[in-house]
Swiss-Prot record:
InterPro entries: MFS_dom, MFS_ERD6/Tret1-like, MFS_sugar_transport-like, MFS_trans_sf, MFS_Trehalose_Transporter, Sugar/inositol_transpt, Sugar_transporter_CS. Belongs to the major facilitator superfamily. Sugar transporter (TC 2.A.1.1) family. Its main location: membrane. The chain crosses the membrane at residues 26-46, 75-95, 105-125, 128-148, 155-177, 183-203, 266-286, 301-321, 328-348, 359-379, 402-422, 428-448. This is Sugar transporter ERD6-like 11. It is found in: Membrane. GO terms for cellular component: membrane. Sugar transporter. GO terms for molecular function: sugar transmembrane transporter activity. SUPFAM superfamilies: MFS general substrate transporter. It comes from Arabidopsis thaliana (Mouse-ear cress). Signal peptide: none annotated.
Amino acid sequence: MVVEEENRSMEEGLLQHQNDRDDRRITACVILSTFVAVCSAFSYGCAAGYTSGAETAIMKELDLSMAQFSAFGSFLNVGGAVGALFSGQLAVILGRRRTLWACDFFCVFGWLSIAFAKNVFWLDLGRISLGIGVGLISYVVPVYIAEITPKHVRGAFTASNQLLQNSGVSLIYFFGTVINWRVMAVIGAIPCILQTIGIFFIPESPRWLAKIRLSKEVESSLHRLRGKDTDVSGEAAEIQVMTKMLEEDSKSSFSDMFQKKYRRTLVVGIGLMLIQQLSGASGITYYSNAIFRKAGFSERLGSMIFGVFVIPKALVGLILVDRWGRRPLLLASAVGMSIGSLLIGVSFTLQQMNVLPELIPIFVFVNILVYFGCFAFGIGGLPWVIMSEIFPINIKVSAGTIVALTSWTSGWFVSYAFNFMFEWSAQGTFYIFAAVGGMSFIFIWMLVPETKGQSLEELQASLTGTS
């Protein structure tokens, strides 16, 4: 009897060891699925950086005023808000994969409308359509990646979304000043066309399948993601039990997310998006050439160096997010962005006083690199990583929609107001951004939880007090 018990214990121990090893396995399917999902993020980055390099050429060819071009730039955020409003519901009704197809439709139409625009109407329509597409992307891509990846690499894989966005921005910055703006719009559509094809070869999210009660499909999806020879019964059971428990606990009405147990997650999600946008990132990204021009730095040289610089910084975040955790990177990012903004403001103050005029262009440019380097490894992408992790499945639609909508509406405000603020006071604009960075540090320190190393079910249970 004792021998049988010992044998059983050994078998259970070996099985647990095997399951732990399987949980840490990264399959080709996970890599392919993540790559396909982030193709549209590359297009998103192209859209974000597009107005900077194309500003002079578009305004000249289509005879646009500064107000018209500012509106064109900000319409990406207007469309993004519309896309964000419907993103969660679409992801539930259609599933994650088919929602990605919807993203591709809006993005390809938007890029081609811009590429062949003969007047401001088609230009703006294309920008709005592109915005709707990237508004959907901003929700569904990080959610899909978080739902398919093993917990020990979830942060890095989800952060690859930001890496591809930065790569898109870099491409536009590097080539935008030397390639015709219409050709660049066509190039921006290519990743979405590739994604449209790639979606045929990737599995649906097992957590979405669990939500719609497709038990066999949950295991089938997990087998593709974890390996055919892997025992996925434990993970499948955990996903289905947690999903069922949450849905029984709440009927998933819009008001559910305002329950006391979800209050912290909602405040964290909304707060991080406000930090990301009100720190000035959209305005600086959209109109960086105007900043270079004001500082007296070469627009072409500045854009090309920026394009090379930003990708390695995003890679730092990708490598460290599952080693150091989300909080340390967010805190370091907030400090660095605040210092960078402060020093840019000081530079423009010295320029106005005609102090060290020969050094001001270099000083402004270096601190823009500091700002964006710190943005890239932290606040640029980690708010979306955390958003994809902290909301339980029963409120993920409503809460995720509100959080994404917050990002896009605040981004619209910054992107539209930036040119007018910059004309009012270059230094004042960056002092405001520096103050936001300082407040961001306090917010992150006091409220943002560490999410690394936990399954989505474990994390959400700890945040909401569900056992």
